[in-house]
Structure formats: C-alpha cells, structure tokens
Amino acid sequence: MVMEGMGMAAAWAAGDLWVLAAAVVAGVVLVDAVVRRAHDWVRVAALGAERRSRLPPGEMGWPMVGSMWAFLRAFKSGNPDAFIASFIRRFGRTGVYRTFMFSSPTILAVTPEACKQVLMDDEGFVTGWPKATVTLIGPKSFVNMSYDDHRRIRKLTAAPINGFDALTTYLSFIDQTVVASLRRWSSPESGQVEFLTELRRMTFKIIVQIFMSGADDATMEALERSYTDLNYGMRAMAINLPGFAYYRALRARRKLVSVLQGVLDGRRAAAAKGFKRSGAMDMMDRLIEAEDERGRRLADDEIVDVLIMYLNAGHESSGHITMWATVFLQENPDIFARAKAEQEEIMRSIPATQNGLTLRDFKKMHFLSQVVDETLRCVNISFVSFRQATRDIFVNGYLIPKGWKVQLWYRSVHMDDQVYPDPKMFNPSRWEGPPPKAGTFLPFGLGARLCPGNDLAKLEISVFLHHFLLGYKLKRANPKCRVRYLPHPRPVDNCLATITKVSDEH
C-alpha cells in the first residue's frame, strides 16, 4: 500500500508539472500577444480610426525590436526569403505590409507594382535609410541627400563613369588588371586563393584608379581593409559597444575619413603651389573643382562622403557578382559551353589589326549579358532600399502615412515565382526576348536614383568573365559550404578555390 501511495503521489506530481508547464507556455503566449497588440496600437493610435482602417496588414512586433529579430534570424539561418514569406503566409499577397524595423514604423513593399510606384515618385518619397547607415556612409552622401542635391552631384559624377566615351577610357586598364590578376592567381605558387577576397581587391584597385588615380599601394590597402569592417556593420544592429559589428564599422569610417581627407589635403596643397598632376582628371579632381550655378564649391566633408559611397559601391557589388557568375558558370557546364562559344566567335571576328577588345565587341556579347543579368537577379546584392513618405500616399490601395519609412524589397521581386518561374534556378535564357517590365528587375534600383555606376559595374564583370571563359577554370575547395547573406551573399570560406589556366592561347 505504501508503494502504491508513493506511485500515485509521483503520478500526481508529474501531472502537476505538466499542468504547470502548460500554464507557463500559455502565459508566455498570452503576454507575447498582449505586448505585440499594445505596441501595434501605440504606433497607429495617433492616425485616427479612418486612417488606421486603410493601413496594410501586418504587425509591429515587440517594442524597440519590432521585426528585427525575425529579419536577422531569416538571413542568418540561410533562408533569407523566409522573412517576407512569413508576411505573405499570415496576411496574404497584398504587396505591402506594415511592421516596425530600424526603430521606425515601416511599410514593406514586395511586388513590382508597389516598388515601381514608390521609386518613380520623387515628390512623395525621399530617401529614408536608417540613421545607422547614414552615419556609416555619410550624411553628405546619396543615402541622405535631398532630391536637388542628389541631382546636382549625380550630374557631376555620373558622366565620367557612364557612356561610351567614359567606358572606353577605362576599358584598357580594366582589361590589363583582370589579365594580370588571373595570371597571378593561377600561378603554381599561388595555390588556393580566397576567390571573393581577391576579386574584391581587384575591383577595388579599378575603382580607386578611376576616382583617385595615383593612389599608392599603402593608401589602397588601408582603404580596402576599412571597407570590409564598414560593410559588416551596414546591416547589423546599431549597437555601439566593443565586440559588435556596428562598433567596428564606426571605427572603420573614421579611418576612411582620415585617409581620404589626407589625400584631399595633399591635392589642395599641391594645387595651391601651382603643381599639376600628370594624366587625366580623376573623380577627386572633378569634385574639388566643381561649382554650382551660384559658384559654390563642395566642402571637404561633402567630397569625402561622396567618395566613401562611390568607392564602396564600386567594388563590393562588382566583386561579389563576378564571383557568383563564375561559380554559376562552373556549376552549369551547358551554360558555360554556350557562353564560351560566344566569346570564341567574337574573338574570331576581331580584325588582326585590332589590339584587344573594344566596347563594341562587348555590346555583341548578348548571352554573356544574360548571364550577368541572371546573376544579378539570383544574388540580390542590394536586397532592399529605403524611402520615407513625405505625405499620406496610397500604394496598392493601402495607406502609407506621412513620415513612415518604406522598405523596397528587391529580393522579394526577383525571387517571386509569379514574376520569374522557378526563381531559384540559374537560367540566363529567361532574358531572351523583350526587356523585362519596369519594376520587375531592380538590381540597380529605378528612377532618378538609379545607381549611376551600373554600366561600369557590368563592364568590369563582363571583362573578367570573357577572360575566364576562354582560358581558366575554378575548382572550389568547399563547394557545399554555407552561404552567409549579410551584408552580402557570400560563401563563409570566401570561395576558397584553385584557379587553373587551361588554355595557352589566351
């Protein structure tokens, strides 16, 4: 009887534990729901009943945090598309959703129609990047400029890096740099290389030559190291404490400012003494001498911020896309063969008197252009951009209140199976036929703030792929290694690989 009593007591105790556990879980769920509902109400209460009823579906999440944890969890788990997919699953395919991110009430625009409307409306929407990003890139850069200032600086800086004449000027240097890099990486003494790291260095050398010609190796190395830390802090939580990515990014920005200011001071001092630099004007020269219609020149902090922005964008995107395009080609032998055949045909058509490729030759590389576009779509280097509503505006039939932030999810557009069938498949042939509808292909944005260096970036990528296809192969050390998606998609081993020269004719 005693044993039976003890058994019954144990059973009752176990039952009590289950009840207690269930009560705790229910309590946590209830508290979570109450806190989320309260935060949502606080954020929208001031809008009034009529405006609240017109908001898109969604939720604000927890105070201070909002959807940031869900965003970071999705991107760090290796499934970045899960973040937007959770909104679609819970609230339907409305195209826009409300949430709370980067310390602000935010609308997520995830369809071509919604993104196009926001990007083409320069009066209704201004730049709305998070304060942390503005701090890192610079308050005088494009991410924080008014429409008029952006138009003025863009007009000044876009012409020297776009258009037939400008690109022709840079083609020879790009070609020489690519050829020398491939030969060095494929030499027996190089062994395995971090392919992405080397590509970033190569593209950085190119962009520094364009913007700051004559910069010595020490300056380039100091800048390149700092940009690595800067980029890791771009999409991180803005926690300015030792050990956090944002803390290191702030230190990197200070180093960048110091190095660029030193170069700028040297240019100004030389000009004051009447010294003239040899060679053509570079971007820094143009920024120093630029005047607006009222005769106002750019201050040093404006020049430094514009340079930080351009130098970063000019090598990060090109380096990453070049790596992924090479990897995709190597993983798809049929696509590789077709792209290589196109390059061989173009080489056969070049007159014997012509020294190297011309820009017109690159215009003939139709399939290679499709490879680049498909890589841009699949990789999504710039997966999101930011705007802020200047007034109440309706998008997809829903209200975006004045002052609210808008995130334009380019990645969601590019990976939408209703826009691109089988979106995870690398298929350059999907670009055959008419050009894509406006709003469906957004690797460089759209409208007045379209990335001014897009043509230069595509030329760099194409030059590299041309030489790689004709003479080299890539063998990855860890082809199945995990991909990290922040700040940009990359293999965790930076694509550790062996580059082998396979043709002596090239």
Curated annotation (Swiss-Prot):
CDD domains: CYP90-like
EC class name: oxidoreductase
The protein's Enzyme Commission number: 1.14.14.107
The protein's annotated pathway: Plant hormone biosynthesis; gibberellin biosynthesis
GO term, biological process aspect, one: gibberellin biosynthetic process
Topology with respect to the bilayer: Single-pass membrane protein
Known tissue expression: Expressed in roots and panicles. Expressed at low levels in vegetative shoot apices, leaf sheaths, leaf blades and stems.
Primary localisation category: endoplasmic reticulum
Family indicated by similarity: Belongs to the cytochrome P450 family.
Function: Involved in gibberellin (GA) biosynthesis. Catalyzes three successive oxidations of ent-kaurenoic acid giving gibberellin 12 (GA12), a key step in GAs biosynthesis. GAs, which are involved many processes, including stem elongation, play a central role in plant development. Required for pollen germination and elongation.
The protein's name: Ent-kaurenoic acid oxidase
Species name: Oryza sativa subsp. japonica
Lineage, highest ranks first: Eukaryota, Viridiplantae, Streptophyta, Embryophyta, Tracheophyta
Name of the gene: KAO
